[in-house]
Design a protein with these regions (language model features):
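Alpha-helical transmembrane signal-anchor/signal-peptide segments
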Residues: 65-87
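Juxtamembrane interface at the cytosolic side of transmembrane helices
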Residues: 293-343
């Protein structure tokens, strides 16, 4: 029996050592389990592309039809609601005192079944800016015990040492344009209940948290809040606090719960309060219906149609190649060492 002598003079029996450390044999540990290794033959590739194309193209058509079935009215008013004399200095006008009532007329070109959703759309407003997004405190919004936790809310954190509730730039810049609608000299009521996410109302905004010291010092960023209502009931704030990812976004203002008929004229009396002029932003009023896919958005339908069309094109191309110039699977003549030097 062979043996080895270690540096310390100890003697080990190599045969016994190897046998004692050998793991128990298993097909799993030795990677000998039976396995299926599918081969992508040309027929399988053609069939896969064909199935994807046949499924995606009709899906794209359905999505586009649903999107085009949405009736939408968009009215940009930020420029038209500035008096001619003030259009060279819009910021001075919007930050000045006095009512900024603006009357608009909207024509319904296609019937809109209720509910008709009322949105405001802002452009060139970067709610995703890091400093802006971080200037808030979610714990303060939920619980009165965290009222003084405003360390992340600068510069809108306190007034004369007293905390601002809700604190931060996001709440401070609350959108405050208002809209009133009428038809045939009769008011069209706008329902502002349940315009926010239920999960936000119940879990992110406390029922016993009330506004304090909000918008009480200059500069005023946006809208004010009712100090007698808890944050969980201030749905305009809840909608606004769900920040947008892109510089152009829409937020729900309310719902008109009656049908609007084709050819009708809707009169809008709005308060043009919100300052988008200092950053060259745009404001638009949007009336829209919905479909089973939501609002109007052609992207999903176009994406399905594009992918499906490409797959059908590839399926046809590979089928033609397969018929015109077939190649037997596993043919050794195509191996590089079996080809002639000139081939």
């Amino acid at each position: 029996m062979s043996s080895t002598v270690g540096g310390g003079g100890s003697v080990e029996t190599s045969g016994v050592r190897r046998t004692s450390k050998r793991p128990k044999y298993s097909k799993f540990t030795q990677q000998e389990l039976p396995a299926c290794k599918p081969i992508l033959t040309l027929r399988w590739v053609i069939l896969t592309f064909l199935v994807v194309g046949v499924v995606f193209v009709p899906l794209g058509v359905f999505c586009l039809r649903a999107s085009h079935g949405v009736v939408e009215i968009v009215d940009r008013y930020d420029t038209d609601c500035i008096p001619e004399a003030s259009r060279n200095n819009k910021v001075a006008y919007i930050t000045g005192v006095g009512d900024k009532i603006c009357n608009r007329t909207i024509t319904v070109h296609k019937a809109m079944k209720h509910p008709v959703y009322v949105y405001y759309q802002l452009e060139n407003f970067y709610q995703n800016h890091r400093r802006y997004v971080k200037s808030r405190n979610d714990a303060q919004l939920r619980s009165p015990s965290d009222e003084r936790d405003v360390k992340t809310c600068a510069p809108e954190d306190n007034v004369d040492g007293e905390p601002i509730v809700p604190c931060g730039l996001v709440a401070w810049s609350l959108f405050n344009d208002t809209y009133r609608f009428s038809r045939n000299n009769q008011q069209l009521p706008v329902n502002k209940k349940d315009i926010s996410w239920k999960s936000d109302r119940e879990k992110k905004f406390g029922k016993n948290v009330f506004p304090k010291n909000f918008q009480t010092r200059e500069p005023i960023g946006g809208g004010t809040l009712d100090p007698k209502k808890p944050l969980s009931e201030q749905e305009d704030l809840i909608v606004w606090m769900r920040t947008a990812a892109l510089p152009t976004f829409r937020k729900l203002y309310g719902k008109i719960e009656t049908d609007l008929h084709a050819g009708e004229t809707i009169r809008v009396s709005l308060q043009n309060n919100y300052n988008t002029y200092s950053f060259n932003g745009e404001k638009k009023l949007v009336l829209s219906t919905t479909s089973w896919l939501g609002g109007r958005n052609d992207f999903l339908g176009i994406a399905y149609l594009t992918v499906g069309s490409i797959c059908l094109f590839l399926a046809v191309t590979f089928s033609v190649l397969y018929l015109v110039k077939p190649r037997q699977l596993g043919d050794p003549t195509y191996l590089s060492w079996n080809r002639s030097a000139g081939g």
